C-alpha cells in the first residue's frame, strides 16, 4: 500500500511503499495513557443511575420522589412527566431509520423487566443508591407478551400509543405488534421441492446473545461556554447519536456536540445511542 506524505523540510510530496507507518495513538495506548471515555471523565462528575421496572408490562400510576429528592447530594430526579414526549429509535442507523420511533427517554408505560422508570443524578453513588430506594412507585400491572408466536395480532399491544411511527415502509404496524415484516422469493420453490429426493423441515431456536467488548457502554456529559451539550461516549456512531439525541430532547442539532474517544471494542453493539 502506498501513502502520499509531505516532507516537512522540503515541502515536497513523497510516497511510502511497503513501509511501516506509525499510528498516531500507538504510544498512548501501549503506555497506558488516558484515552478511553472513563479515563477522560472529570472526577467531580455527577453519578447517574436509572430506577428499573420490576414488571414485564405495567403503567406507572403514581411516582413519589419527594423524600428521595431531599437526600443530601441529590441534584436531580426525572420521571416520565419531566421529559419531552417525542418518540425516537435507539438504533444508530442513517436517517430515515428503518427502525420504528417507539421509545421515549422515560415512558409512563414499561414494557420489560428493567425498563427505565426514573433517572437519578447525585454527587456520590451512595447518595444516588439511597435516593433510589426511597422513590415510591405505584404500578398498574398488565399482562405481558411472553411468546413471540402469540404476539402478532394478539390481544396485548406492546405499543398502543398513537404517536408511534415508522419512517420507512418495512411493514411495521404497532397495532399488530409488528416492528417489521416482509418476504422475498426467487424462482419456483415448489418446482425445486418436487425435484428433491429428500426435504428436511426443522425449526431452530437460539438464545439471545451480545458482543463482549472489554470496554462497556459509558458516557459523560457537560455544558460548554456556548451553551452546547457535550457528550463524550464510547459509541461507534457519533453523528447518529447527535441527531437522535437532538430529536429525543427536542432541541437543535447545533446545541449538541458528540465526542468519540478511543473505544475499547464495539463489534456493532455500540452502534446505538448509549
Regions found by a protein language model. Name each.
Residues 1-171, 199:
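Flexible, low-hydrophobicity surface segments
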Amino acid at each position: 500500500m502506498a501513502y502520499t506524505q509531505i516532507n516537512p523540510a522540503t515541502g515536497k510530496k513523497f510516497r511510502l511503499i511497503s513501509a511501516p507507518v506509525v499510528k498516531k495513538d500507538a504510544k498512548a495506548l501501549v503506555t497506558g495513557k488516558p484515552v478511553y471515555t472513563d479515563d477522560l471523565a472529570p472526577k467531580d462528575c455527577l453519578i447517574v443511575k436509572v430506577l428499573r421496572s420490576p414488571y414485564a408490562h405495567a403503567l406507572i400510576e403514581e411516582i413519589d420522589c419527594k423524600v428521595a429528592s431531599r437526600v443530601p447530594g441529590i441534584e436531580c430526579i426525572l420521571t416520565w412527566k419531566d421529559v419531552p414526549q417525542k418518540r425516537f429509535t435507539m438504533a444508530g442507523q442513517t436517517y430515515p431509520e428503518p427502525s420504528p420511533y417507539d421509545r421515549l427517554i422515560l415512558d409512563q408505560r414499561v414494557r420489560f423487566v428493567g425498563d427505565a422508570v426514573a433517572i437519578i443524578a447525585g454527587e456520590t453513588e451512595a447518595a444516588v443508591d439511597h435516593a433510589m430506594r426511597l422513590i415510591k412507585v405505584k404500578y398498574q400491572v398488565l399482562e405481558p407478551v411472553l411468546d413471540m408466536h402469540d404476539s402478532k395480532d394478539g390481544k396485548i399491544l406492546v405499543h398502543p400509543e398513537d404517536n408511534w411511527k415508522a419512517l420507512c415502509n418495512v411493514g411495521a404496524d404497532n397495532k399488530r405488534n409488528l416492528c417489521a415484516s416482509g418476504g422475498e422469493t426467487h424462482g419456483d420453490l415448489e418446482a425445486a421441492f418436487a425435484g428433491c429426493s429428500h426435504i428436511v423441515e426443522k425449526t431452530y431456536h437460539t438464545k439471545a446473545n451480545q458482543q463482549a467488548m472489554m470496554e462497556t457502554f459509558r458516557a459523560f456529559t457537560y455544558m460548554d461556554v456556548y451553551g452546547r451539550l457535550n457528550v463524550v461516549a464510547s459509541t461507534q456512531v457519533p453523528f447518529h447519536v447527535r441527531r437522535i439525541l437532538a430529536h429525543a430532547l427536542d432541541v437543535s442539532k447545533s446545541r449538541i456536540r458528540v465526542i468519540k474517544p478511543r473505544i475499547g471494542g464495539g463489534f456493532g453493539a455500540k452502534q446505538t445511542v448509549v
